[in-house]
Amino acid sequence: RWAGGLDQVVSACGGSHGAAKLLENNANGASAGRATTTDAINLTSAVTRGYGDTSATAVQKVSDLAFVTVQLGQTTFPELANSMGLVVPLASSMGVEMEQLFAVMATATGVTGGASEVATQLRGVLQSLLAPTGEMTELIKSLGFESGTAMVQQLGLQGTIQQVVAAAEASGAPLQKYMGSIEAQTLALALAGPQADSYAQKL
């Protein structure tokens, strides 16, 4: 089992250096999260590779964040492992911090859907900022930002969502004009409204 785990760590994290430490971190995370070591490796490798840091420190950080997410949200290590890959590359490229990413999962799972639904919803939010509609482009510029990515990096994920939702409400325009997908709208309305305090507390 340990040898097999080492092979999986090397495969998942792209090298053998420090593999034993990575496996130990994943095994500890799995034990804490009541998951298999395979689940933990799949989850930590998806996130750490997406963020470009597969060090033992990064693996431990992701494992800790995932454990807290499972405790505070309505999800599991396997569900997170199967879902995070949907949104991590986009989140990382736009400067969304790991803490923000996991706080969304902890807040929205069980509220707007399961882990895969929440990951899809968050991806929709980020896509609406990365490839904005005409209305979203005007909004971003009117707030003094060059791009949606710059907005996220300066205001944070929730701050950005709150600004967009508030602007839509102030203009009387449906949120759909700014965020085209119903999935994105679902998460945005939750994080800017009923779940705003919950997200802030979990962050």
Predicted regions, residues:
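Amphipathic alpha-helical interface segments used for oligomerization, scaffolding
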Residues: 1-202
